[in-house]
Swiss-Prot record:
Keyword Coiled coil annotated: no
Keywords: Ribonucleoprotein, Ribosomal protein, RNA-binding, rRNA-binding
Organism: Prochlorococcus marinus (strain MIT 9312)
Function field: This protein binds specifically to 23S rRNA; its binding is stimulated by other ribosomal proteins, e.g. L4, L17, and L20. It is important during the early stages of 50S assembly. It makes multiple contacts with different domains of the 23S rRNA in the assembled 50S subunit and ribosome.
Any GO BP annotation: translation
GO CC annotations, alphabetized: cytosolic large ribosomal subunit
Family per similarity comment: Belongs to the universal ribosomal protein uL22 family.
Tagged with keyword Transferase: no
Record's protein name: Large ribosomal subunit protein uL22
A Pfam family the protein falls into: Ribosomal_L22
Oligomer and partners: Part of the 50S ribosomal subunit.
Disulfide pattern: none
Single GO term (MF): rRNA binding
Gene behind the chain: rplV
Length: 128
């Protein structure tokens, strides 16, 4: 048996130990997943969330990896997958009244974005 499926090259970039919770980063990643590189950059520029800056940095790194490692054209790239996982939690303490202390959890996350070249659509016209 021969495998006739075409393999696509995928470039991945990771941003580790990014300050911010994974759930707030996922809110932005859900909006750009499946979009083209240029559309995603425009969306990230105008979103009012703090997590857009590190996401933009990771996205640009993924596109640079695609250009350098595989020679892909940035105008044809789409975001095939994007995810955020929980990172380590930094624990801090805030002094309170009567000798108490409340804990403050400063969350981090790991952002990963993979891009691949968009499938080219060939219009096969039947000529009579």
């Amino acid at each position: 048996m021969t495998n006739t499926s075409e393999t696509t090259k995928t470039a991945i970039a990771h941003g580790n130990y990014v300050r911010g919770s994974a759930s707030k980063v996922r809110r932005v990643l859900d909006q750009i997943r499946g979009r083209s590189y240029r559309d995603a950059l425009i969306m990230l520029e105008f979103m009012p969330y703090r997590s857009t800056d590190p996401i933009t940095k990771v996205l640009r790194s993924a596109v640079a990896n695609a250009e350098h490692n595989y020679g892909m054209d940035p105008s044809t790239l789409i975001i095939s997958s994007a995810w955020a996982n929980n990172g380590p939690v930094m624990k801090r303490y805030r002094p309170r009244a009567q000798g108490r202390a409340f804990s403050i959890k400063k969350q981090t996350c790991h952002i990963s974005i993979s891009v691949e070249s968009a499938p080219t659509q060939i219009n096969a016209e039947v000529q009579n």
